[in-house]
């Protein structure tokens, strides 16, 4: 029945409008995170600190010292922090440029009242590009074929589309023209010669967070942009050159060029030692109940943990479906009342168990910190990354997309 209703609705749209409905990604929330009810009855939630975010923006702007413009990268729903929550701070701090990946992100950025520069930082499909014309978004272009197709779309709508020509200067081999070959340079020249595309920027992206590798990619980018500007007879004063992500922005100042694209640094996700940037996200849950079990009992699926003593185990209302992955089985820790307690047994779909035997004050209803700080304790980025075997962004983008979010200050 649901399928038949959907089919009927689609048929009605086609009958009434003469057009097939455009299906897109699930709508992102415009919630600004100020309603406590969004997390009060939730099993797990993400807290986002507006003060930390605004502090990080100001710190970054001060470091740039007006020599490079800041483009705030808010892809993946602002790295899981929620574009609806983040945009008021972006606007309040006067950030001139926002970068996104999806049309839905672009919609929320514009709906928030942002009228500045909006850029997509990945290759779009042709249907995405056409739909995004309504958001006045600048598009990444990295092939002559795509440029011709984009030009045709812009012409059909009577528009001129602003584009950023991407180079494969550091070997990402993902979006950019390969300027190390003559055929690639020929493609770049063709891209600059499309009637309905306005070239406003030249860009690249660094493949490795390593200073020497960044400098090597930067040298290639500088040579390649110089060549294209000369041979395509471009006006350098009308072009924005940008390459630096958060790592390059903070660690290789010469890579900042005209504009930097920072995402992680805005949210406090930086290299070790950059303590001036504050973490903007915490991931939390609650204790459902505390149970007593005798020594010798096993815990969880597949009996991966055996109690060595009579124990008190707290049942936490979060699991791998909420983004707390099974990799933390018998390895992770959480904070309850400031106590650091270990995860025991396999993380389940909706539940995990922790050993609170040594802490009689732990009881049902207590707040649990899965990532972040509590009463002097901390679950750190380093330990989460070591156990997960990947960057923290691999986790917090999922936490944010799987759980409600709230601003805490």
Curated annotation (Swiss-Prot):
Q: Which family does it belong to?
A: Belongs to the alanine racemase family. Bsr subfamily.
Q: Which cofactor does it need?
A: pyridoxal 5'-phosphate
Q: Which domain of life is it from?
A: Bacteria
Q: Where is substrate bound in this sequence?
A: 174, 349
Give the protein name, as stated in the record. Broad specificity amino-acid racemase
Known catalytic reactions = an L-alpha-amino acid = a D-alpha-amino acid; L-lysine = D-lysine; L-arginine = D-arginine; L-alanine = D-alanine
Among PROSITE patterns, the record links this protein to: ALANINE_RACEMASE
Would I find Signal among this entry's keywords?
Answer: yes
Enzyme class name: isomerase
Q: What is the lineage of its organism?
A: Bacteria, Pseudomonadati, Pseudomonadota, Gammaproteobacteria, Pseudomonadales
Which residues does the Swiss-Prot or TrEMBL record annotate as the active site?
Answer: 75 (proton acceptor), 301 (proton acceptor)
Task: Cite the Gene3D superfamilies for this sequence.
Answer: Alanine racemase, Lyase, Ornithine Decarboxylase, Chain A, domain 1
Pfam families in alphabetical order = Ala_racemase_C (PF00842), Ala_racemase_N (PF01168)
Q: Quote the temperature dependence note.
A: Optimum temperature is 37 degrees Celsius.
